[in-house]
Amino acid sequence: MKTVSGLDVHKDTIFACVLQKDNVPFIKEYSTMTCGIEELSDDLRSMGVKTVAMESTGIYWMPVWEVLERHFKLILVNPYYIKQVPGRKTDVKDAQWIATLLQKGLLKGSFVPDHLLRELREYERGYVRLSNQETRLEQTIERQLIKCNIRITSFATKIGSATVMKIVQAICEGEVRANELEKLVHGRIRNKHKEKIHQSLQGVIRPCDKLLLNQSYQQYQLVKQQQNELIEQMNRICHDHFEKEMKALGTIPGINYLSSMTILAEIGNDMASFPTDKHLVSWAGLRPRNDESAGKIKSKKVTHGNKYLRRIMVQCAWAASRTKGSWFQGKFQQLCVRKSERKALIAIARKQLMIIYLLLQTKQDYVAPVQMLTADQKQRKVKYYQKQLDVLLNMG
């Protein structure tokens, strides 16, 4: 039998269990400091370990992975699938249990991208977190404007528009006169709403309102700057290493350049990690769960999966369902007849992800499917249009 190791990783400690050919376990506790991980690596190599398995415990496994991947084949395991028997759970027994399952070939590894994709993923997920902060700051700025009775957000398309931000900046710099603030409003908005714009800018701004508004505005500008820095790094990696894949994904309706970078950061460009498109869809959390007992289906809700990938795929599906003339728009409208809009959107996202899998696997561009009608469908259409023609002729 192969010599393997199972690791139970915590914030400050790592419990390692090595199972050798004689099945006598070697168990030792290590520090999560870099020196401790290096010591762990040296010990495993000296005992002839080739494969190491560990649980995906939060972010604690990441630095351990970075050090050990230089010398070992690593397997990251979802803790849900290797639960210990109740009443027998200790750190040492957890490490021993992982090593035992690994030695018997019963572990299924999670997808861990290579170093380059991990870097791209860090930038992408950082951008998502900043986008959430941006939304919260926009809401904070709107609340503070309403407290001052500045109602320009009722007429602008969104809080982060150039018009609103120019007015906020002017207020922060001390300008409170409605006539001067009105000059900063986009001409189209002024022409459309006229006198209401002037009235919406006649607010009551206290010193405390100005201070809080200025703080929120400064935070907002910082977030926008940090977003641009992350996008610049994402652009660099994708342009240097994934230009063909970016071009292929861009041919799919509803997927723009930023969406393509996000998708690649989450799934990579090599589909060998996913045996079929169904595995990828399941990993993304876009397939119905199997919850059946005694012939009764209890739930068909989508499974928990990669929240970052599922989020961007639903956004792309929403855009594709509104792309005029696209196959996705027709399919979405067809599904909405018998399903809720939300379920139809998930179905479109699932279909898009299956297409992405095929494009990345075959290295081809997207070609819109041609609607092929069966003989019965053609006959029904002929009858329908013949009936409409008869109605028009009778009207004359």
Give the role of each language-model region:
Residues 1-396:
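A detector of single, family-specific signature residues
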